[in-house]
A protein has these predicted regions:
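A short pre-motif secondary-structure segment
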Residues: 21-25
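C-terminal edge and immediately downstream basic/flexible tail or linker adjoining helix-turn-helix-like DNA-binding
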Residues: 4-6, 33, 37-40, 54-65
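Acidic, proline/glycine-rich intrinsically disordered inter-domain spacer in sigma factors
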Residues: 1-12
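Flexible coil/turn residues that form the inter-helical turn or adjacent wing/linker of helix-turn-helix
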Residues: 28-29
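The N-cap/first-turn positions of alpha helices
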Residues: 17-18
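Residues within the DNA-recognition helix of helix-turn-helix
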Residues: 49-52
Length: 65
């Protein structure tokens, strides 16, 4: 659908670290702590990546970026 294509386009604009964190959090259902261990960055950094990515994706999908 058009919405899926738009979301894929928006996801492609994320930095790789953020993209990885979002996929681990939502598709793999990993905790922030486990993502932190997997990527080697502090938990708060991972939380920031996910939060900013969610905000960006919401704006992007609605055409507000």
């Amino acid at each position: 659908s058009e919405e899926v294509l738009k979301l894929e386009e928006c996801i492609s604009q994320l930095q790789q670290n953020s993209k990885d964190a979002v996929f681990m959090a939502y598709y793999n259902e990993m905790t922030y702590e486990n993502i932190s261990k997997a990527v080697g960055f502090p938990v708060n950094t991972v939380k920031t990546w996910v939060r900013r990515s969610k905000d960006f994706l919401n704006r992007c999908v609605r055409g507000l970026h």
